[in-house]
Amino acid sequence: MFILIAIVSDIHGNLPALEVVIEDIKKHDVEKIISLGDVSGYYPFINEVIDILKENNAINIIGNHDRYIIDNNECPRSHSANICLNYQKSVITNENKEWLKTSISKYEIDNISMVHGGWVDNEDEYMMKIKDDYFEKLPFKYFFCGHTHVQKHIKMINNKEFINPGSVGQPRDGNKEAAYCLFDEKIGEVILKRVDYDIDKVALKMKEIGFG
């Protein structure tokens, strides 16, 4: 029996994008949903996206933006990111903050390893250039991470595979559609997915709460 996993990442508080992704996921016989982190940051719907993940029993791997919320820290690289992080810190419910605290640092089972950033720094390493020797001594075949917001699937010469499902909430690969992927554990099949959504809904909400 196959086990189909839906892998999402970098939702960043973008409710309209997550809603269409969940709708698309439900068209498939998915056993579980795993979030590679950064539920938080950039867009305002922090409680709504966490509620959806909870409703779908999703596992969340902690991302750097999630850490900023939990530890009440700021992003050292982006003033604009901190503006929305501060908003999210002010509105997130205690229940949802506690859920965020249950996020795991990585998910590893059989020949699969999943993190938010990379395998040196799970939370804040950018895996932009994929080199075979980086993974050579790591005892897994399938490596999943987010953080870069760039969807890709690379088959390496050492029979290992690198997969970034892309970003649900803020793609940075030239395609504005929300990104995620499906993974068939039994046969090792990776299916990269894109789903269109109404970006104007996000822009309107941002204006309503005073961002632009």
Q: Can you annotate each of these PLM segments?
A:
Residues 3, 77-79, 112-137, 171:
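Active-site-proximal segments of metal-dependent phosphoesterases and phosphodiesterases across multiple
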Residues 6-9, 13-97:
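Core catalytic region of metal-dependent phosphoesterases/phosphodiesterases
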Residues 105-110, 154-158:
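Short acidic-hydrophobic surface loop/beta-edge motif
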Residues 4-12, 111-118, 162-166:
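Active-site-proximal beta-strand elements of phosphoester/diester hydrolases
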Residues 12-17, 41-44, 65-70, 120-122, ...:
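Active-site environment of divalent metal-dependent phosphoester hydrolases
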Residues 155-212:
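Acidic, His/Gly-rich catalytic cores of divalent-metal-dependent hydrolytic chemistry
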Residues 6, 34, 59, 112, ...:
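Hydrophobic "anchor" residues on beta-strands that sit immediately upstream
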Residues 117, 128-156, 160-165, 178:
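Anionic-ligand binding region
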